[in-house]
Amino acid sequence: MSRTRTSVSKSIHRRAVLGGMAAAGAFSVAGPYVARAQQGDINIGVLLPFTGSQGAYGPDMRKAAELTTKIVNDAGGIMGGRKFRLFFEDDESSPTAGLAATKKLLEVNKCVAVIGIWGSPIAMAIKPVLVNANTCMMVSGAANAITDGDTKGLVWRFQAKATDWGPAMAQAMLSRGWKTVSILAQQNAFVIPMIEPAKKTFAAGGAKVLDTVIYNPDQPSYRAEVQRIFGANPAPEAVMCLGLLTDFVSIVREEVRMGATSKIMALSIMADAEGKFIEAVGPDVAEGIEHFQPAPPLGTPSYRKFLKLMGATDDNALYLFAGNTHDQICTLALAMEKAKSTDSLVYTKEIPAVDNPPGEEVDDIIVALDKVRAGVKINFQGAGSICDFDARGDQLNRHFGHFRIEKGKQKLVQIIKGPTG
């Protein structure tokens, strides 16, 4: 079965290198990046999903962290020759497993930062432990609560926060001319904060929200929810789907089975997921589904340099999350170098000084380190984002990508600008 949608011109091709969960087998799930510890090594924990519902994202994030660390270490490291040593742990897409892994990184591996941290539930579970241990955490999770409360300045989000996703996604749907929409969303701390801001944007843009249905994760079936949303009379012109890959595969199969006519815009973590969605349902079923996500700085010198680092063979290759671990390693190196310290309470104070404007824009980590050592004020430009932060550690100036699946490929429709402050 297939859908017919309007074509767009610019193609984002899926890269072949280390794609999806299959690449997890190329690495041990946990272990040090450097075979032997040298005196003065700086231990960094990297907590990522390699298994479970979020496992598609771990391998490329690991690869980016390793390659970026190699660049820093091969150039002599930081603070007079100290090298980063990475310890990887699989959070299994589970807060319980993520918490156990974090404790190991702190207590056994003596890590001075924990980075990666893809899922919001995992981030929220480990946050109290890391903050209590006075250890920096750098996350890709979007739930607003991750940076709430007294974080001691230790929590840094390399991602747009959830309340910024909803309005931007609604704006993309309004740009398609849809006047009636419904929302089908998973019950979790990442998704729920998106809904009300999205509704306000729909209302301001003249679109009517017909219905909102919240479902639980890992339900055996989503038939009742799909029937209520897609089978309504009148049916919405489009449905905003907010959740994860595994539930979306079931939802799409169900709406195709019932012959639904409503268009779909989903989160890219549902409808892209490093190519896993198309693999699961096939290109015909996926045809025309639109999706939306905070995007890396596509087309910039920093992103082109990152594509080369990752071994991408196409200038339009799309990495939604791998750039985050690249940027986290770079930010740690720059902040520690500037602070001349590996104490999280000390070096995290220097993150705005190396990442935020004003300053000379630099996208090369070795050049950036040299300038920091020379006392030059820099504004580091990352591969996952331009790395600007507010006082709470939330990311600013993050843009969003609106994509459409056509003939088994992800095509960029437009870039939506996010909040600037």
Residues covered by each model-derived region:
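Flexible coil/turn residues that form the inter-helical turn or adjacent wing/linker of helix-turn-helix
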Residues: 10
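Sec-dependent signal peptide hydrophobic core
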Residues: 21-25
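Extracytosolic ligand-binding ectodomains
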Residues: 2-5, 13-20, 30-421
